[in-house]
Amino acid sequence: MSLNAETKAAIVAEYAQCENDTGSPEVQVALLTASINHLQGHFANHKHDHHSRRGLLRMVSSRRKLLDYLKGKNSTRYQDLIKRLGLRR
């Protein structure tokens, strides 16, 4: 259910603040968003997969916390990120 290395590298390259940046909130949120979108496709066919649903809810919660952190630190970066990812908020 995880993303492959090429997809992760592409996401990191797109959202990184500088070279080799994998820890910034933008990169972490983008990776979590890609994983969440991947799992949502999984649930279209596997409606009763409750174990994976719990993992999905943990990812959503983690993404929410990172977005709240980023909003508190730098609201312009937060607004730019949710616009780029197409998230509601």
From Swiss-Prot:
Give this protein's Gene Ontology molecular function annotations: rRNA binding; structural constituent of ribosome
Domain of life of the organism in this record?
Answer: Bacteria
Pfam families in the cross-refs: Ribosomal_S15 (PF00312)
A GO cellular component annotation here is: cytosolic small ribosomal subunit
**BP-aspect Gene Ontology terms:** translation
Stored CDD domains: Ribosomal_S15p_S13e (cd00353)
Its keywords, alphabetically, are: Ribonucleoprotein, Ribosomal protein, RNA-binding, rRNA-binding
Q: How does it assemble?
A: Part of the 30S ribosomal subunit. Forms a bridge to the 50S subunit in the 70S ribosome, contacting the 23S rRNA.
Q: Which PANTHER family match?
A: RIBOSOMAL PROTEIN S15, BACTERIAL AND ORGANELLAR, SMALL RIBOSOMAL SUBUNIT PROTEIN US15M
* UniProt-recorded name of the protein: Small ribosomal subunit protein uS15
Q: Which organism is it from?
A: Aliivibrio salmonicida (strain LFI1238) (Vibrio salmonicida (strain LFI1238))
Q: What is the lineage of its organism?
A: Bacteria, Pseudomonadati, Pseudomonadota, Gammaproteobacteria, Vibrionales
